[in-house]
Structures are given as structure tokens and as C-alpha cells.
């Protein structure tokens, strides 16, 4: 991607970062339920993630402008980490930036064994993104019979209405198994190359003996 950088969020860029994140979440909700007067992702919720212990925030810069970003919660041993929030500027989705952000995050924390994140059930774009693009697996489904722990006293999450806010998915991605798959692929590739090399040498020997 042209001139893409994922850099630690600086204090001076935080207001724009939060504004664009709110717009992105608002557009996702609007696409499913129509216009909403409530702020789907209130600023207090963003601040709670930004100021949480072990929080790390990154802004995605493309051609000198913030086009997305993420907020992470990194565990003490960096083994089980949380993707708290991830967004791409409204109107620029489906161009590969979200995937670029995520792959860069994986590179920044190579010792991570598992990543965890959540998303509401109505966000079909997110479901596709996390499962099909990033390799997460759905491991839990929150609903009225199995409520989300972070739900407000009135049964809501953020500015979403009760129906939308009661249904969430929890995702996990196990990095160790993915690394094993990558290592196995490299071994197979190396073995195939060695077989080709050996076959070429045998053919040369056969030609020399003629």
C-alpha cells in the first residue's frame, strides 16, 4: 500500500483519531439500522480503552493523513493480547488498509500466542474481515441468555439500541498454530527445492556417462 505507516498515536493527533473512529463505527451501524441520533461509540468508551493499563494505540498514516488505527491491550508477558478497537476511515474501507494494519500489528508483537477481540453480530463486514481475512475464529456468542459482561445496567453497549447491543461475537486467533503452518510450508518448499536439485545432478551425471 502506498506510503502506509502504522505509528504510535501522538497526543496531538488523538482528537482526530477519535473523531474518525467514531465516524467509522457510526457508518457501520447506519448501514444496518439507518440513521441514529446516539453516538454508537461514545468518546468515554474510546478514552477507557486508550487509558487502560497496558494500552497501546497506533494511527495508520497513508500519504500524510490518518486513515485508520487500532487500540491494543498488551498483557504483561505479551502472550495473550487484546485488539480493543480497530477502524478504517469511513469511505475508504475494502481497499486493504484494515488488513495492512492487522498484519503490521502481528509483526510488532511476534511473541503473542493468542489475540482476542469482539465485534457486534450485525457488523457483517467485520465478521468477514476477522474470520476470512485475518484468520480469527469465533469462540463465543453473547446474547440475552449469555450476556456480554461489559453491558451497561440498562442492557446497552455504547450508543447501540438494546437489540443490537445484546448480540456480540468473541474471536480468538492462535498464532502458534499459524507459525507451525508457515514453518511446515517453508520445510516443504525447501524439500521440494532439494529434490529438484538432486534430480538435476543425477541427470547431469547420466548425461556425462553417455
Task: Tell me what each language-model feature is.
Residues 118-122, 132-162:
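Conserved catalytic-core motifs of GNAT/GCN5-like acyltransferases
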Residues 1-15, 175-210:
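Conserved N-terminal entry element of GNAT/NAT acetyltransferase domains
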Residues 57-59, 65-74, 80-82, 87:
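Conserved beta-strand in the GNAT
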Residues 86-93, 119-121:
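A short, internal acetyl-CoA/4′-phosphopantetheine-binding micro-motif in the GNAT/acyltransferase core
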Residues 43-59, 68, 164:
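A short helix-loop-beta-strand connector motif used in the catalytic cores of GNAT acetyltransferases and
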Residues 108-121:
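Conserved GNAT acetyl-CoA-binding A-motif
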Residues 88, 94-107, 132:
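Conserved acetyl-CoA-binding loop-helix of GNAT-fold acetyltransferases
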Residues 25-46:
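Conserved GNAT-fold acetyl-CoA-binding loop/helix
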Amino acid at each position: 500500500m502506498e506510503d502506509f505507516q502504522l505509528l504510535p498515536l501522538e497526543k496531538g493527533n488523538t482528537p482526530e483519531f477519535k473523531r474518525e473512529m467514531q465516524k467509522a463505527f457510526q457508518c457501520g451501524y447506519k448501514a444496518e439500522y439507518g440513521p441514529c441520533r446516539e453516538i454508537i461509540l461514545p468518546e468515554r468508551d474510546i478514552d477507557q480503552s486508550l487509558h487502560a493499563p497496558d494500552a497501546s494505540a497506533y494511527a495508520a498514516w497513508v500519504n500524510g493523513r490518518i486513515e485508520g488505527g487500532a487500540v491494543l491491550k498488551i498483557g504483561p508477558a505479551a502472550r495473550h493480547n487484546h485488539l480493543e478497537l480497530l477502524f478504517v476511515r469511513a469511505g475508504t474501507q475494502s481497499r486493504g488498509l484494515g488488513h495492512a494494519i492487522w498484519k503490521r500489528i502481528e509483526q510488532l508483537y511476534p511473541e503473542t500466542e493468542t489475540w482476542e477481540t469482539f465485534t457486534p453480530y450485525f457488523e457483517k463486514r467485520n465478521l468477514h474481515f476477522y474470520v476470512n481475512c485475518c484468520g480469527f475464529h469465533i469462540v463465543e456468542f453473547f446474547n440475552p441468555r449469555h450476556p456480554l459482561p461489559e453491558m451497561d445496567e440498562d442492557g446497552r453497549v455504547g450508543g447501540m439500541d438494546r437489540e443490537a447491543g445484546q448480540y456480540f461475537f468473541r474471536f480468538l486467533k492462535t498464532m502458534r498454530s499459524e507459525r507451525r503452518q508457515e514453518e511446515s510450508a517453508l520445510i516443504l518448499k525447501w524439500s521440494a527445492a532439494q529434490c529438484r536439485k538432486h534430480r538435476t545432478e543425477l541427470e547431469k551425471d547420466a548425461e556425462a556417462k553417455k
